[in-house]
Amino acid sequence: MATPGEGNQPSDDGAPQPLAQLQKLEPRVVRRRLSQARHRATLVGLFNNLRKAVYSQSDITASKWQVLNRTKIHIQEQEESLDKLLKLKASFNLQDGNPNSLEEVKEEYARMYSENDSVFLNSFLQDSPPEWFPSEAVGPDAEEEGEEEGEEEGEEGEEEEEGDEEGEEEEENGEEREVEEYQEEEEEEEEEEKKVDLSHSSSTLLPDLMEFERYLNFYKQTMDLLTMNSIISAHEVTLPIVSAAISHLWQTLSEEKKARLLQVWEQQHSAFADLTEACLELAGVEGSMKDSGVDSQGASCSLESTPEEILFEDAFDVASFLDKSEAQHMSNISAMFATCNSENPEEKFQLYIQIIEFFKSLGCVNTPLNQEPEPPDDDDAMLLKCLETFDDL
């Protein structure tokens, strides 16, 4: 019976040990957290001061990585100015015992802070502590904290029990975890800030992409309409004058007409005949048509695809249409070049006018009849010939 009692005796005596260990660890955890809070407050204050120094009041909400980047640029600019002044000083042979070059200034600055960093920091904090620096870290409290840290080091050196060693390991692991968590928080903040900047840039690019997608859709539907009504032949779809005419049509259309036309084409894209009906319907409701409330995205994007997908689909459709037409009419390539040749400027100009007049007859554009279309860049020779003809008359 004595044996079980003796076996239970050590466990009874060792029961208070975990409680004592917790009591010893509690002040350390509190001091460590207080030190971390002071460190974070110091970093926040430094970033705030840097932000105010390198940014104006309108950009006071800049992110940390932007502040660091701007600070780096600011320091480089200050170094360049200082270097110029020191070179000017050296040109006058001024010997005042101070550095005469930028390298000497850097060396003296590094030597001053490496030798007297603690003295300078204490004097700086006692004389004029900044507003962002915690008041607990200045004066007697800072000294008490240093003494407490020294006592902790002595106690840790004297501890030899296994329980204390385990507590130290847990404490170190806890500190490492807190440092890792702090670093992860900083990385997450930087990633979020970068995502916000990217979203701003993408929001500025989206309208241009949508406008380009709308024009591709209009180009494809217009080309189908012209070929269906025999306004242009199959080998004329690749002529620059045709593209110039379609571009002129797109520029003359108002936003309401663009949205309405693309909406009707999207609803009635099953047959080529519906394209003509779309233009006629647009001409019929032109007088009473108001804002349809359809923006560029709603006018040309389906519910099943994203705007980017629709954009690339239309681009591939136009490219495949042009490639197919070119492959089918390789035998007529000489005739196509003859049409594009500057020897027939009247035919090119007539084709341009024919396309514009066809859409005027459908009521899709309201360009005045006496207004000459904007000539493409490759028709300068034709205009010069026209002017010479008028001079001869």
UniProtKB/Swiss-Prot annotation:
Where it mainly occurs, coarsely classed, is cytoplasm
Membrane as a keyword? Answer: no
UniProt-listed GO biological process terms: activation of meiosis; cellular response to retinoic acid; DNA replication; male germ-line stem cell asymmetric division; meiotic cell cycle; oogenesis; positive regulation of transcription by RNA polymerase II; regulation of transcription by RNA polymerase II
The Polar residues compositionally biased stretches are 1-11
- Phenotype seen when the gene is deleted: Female and male mice are infertile due to severe gametogenesis impairment. In female mutant embryos, the initial mitotic development of germ cells is normal, but they fail to undergo promeiotic DNA replication and meiotic chromosome condensation. In male mutants, the premeiotic DNA replication is conserved and germ cells are able to partly condense chromosomes and initiate meiotic recombination. However, they fail to regularily continue over the leptotene stage of prophase I.
Localization per record: Cytoplasm; Nucleus
Where along the sequence does the record place the motif called Nuclear export signal (NES)? 209-218
Query: Which domain of life does the UniProt lineage start with?
Result: Eukaryota
Record keywords, A-Z:
Coiled coil, Cytoplasm, Differentiation, DNA replication, Meiosis, Nucleus, Oogenesis, Phosphoprotein, Spermatogenesis, Transcription, Transcription regulation
- Describe the processing and modification events after translation: Phosphorylated in P19 EC cells.
Family matches, as Pfam families: bHLH_STRA8
Q: Which InterPro entries match?
A: bHLH_STRA8 (IPR057021), Stra8 (IPR033537)
The GO cellular component terms are: cytoplasm; male germ cell nucleus; nucleus
Q: In which tissues is it expressed?
A: Expressed exclusively in premeiotic germ cells in both sexes. In females, is expressed in the embryonic ovary. In males, is expressed in pubertal and adult testes, in premeiotic spermatogenic cells. Expressed by some type A and B spermatogonia, preleptotene spermatocytes, and early leptotene spermatocytes (at protein level). Expression begins in late undifferentiated spermatogonia and persists during differentiating spermatogonia (at protein level).
- Subunit structure, as described in the record: Interacts with XPO1. Interacts with MEIOSIN.
Q: Quote the function comment for this protein.
A: Meiosis-inducer required for the transition into meiosis for both female and male germ cells. In female germ cells, acts downstream of ZGLP1 as a key effector of the meiotic program: required for premeiotic DNA replication and subsequent events in meiotic prophase. During spermatogenesis, next to its role in meiotic initiation, promotes (but is not required for) spermatogonial differentiation. In complex with MEIOSIN, directly activates the transcription of a subset of critical meiotic genes playing a central role in cell-cycle switching from mitosis to meiosis.
Can you say what this protein is called?
Stimulated by retinoic acid gene 8 protein
Species, as recorded: Mus musculus
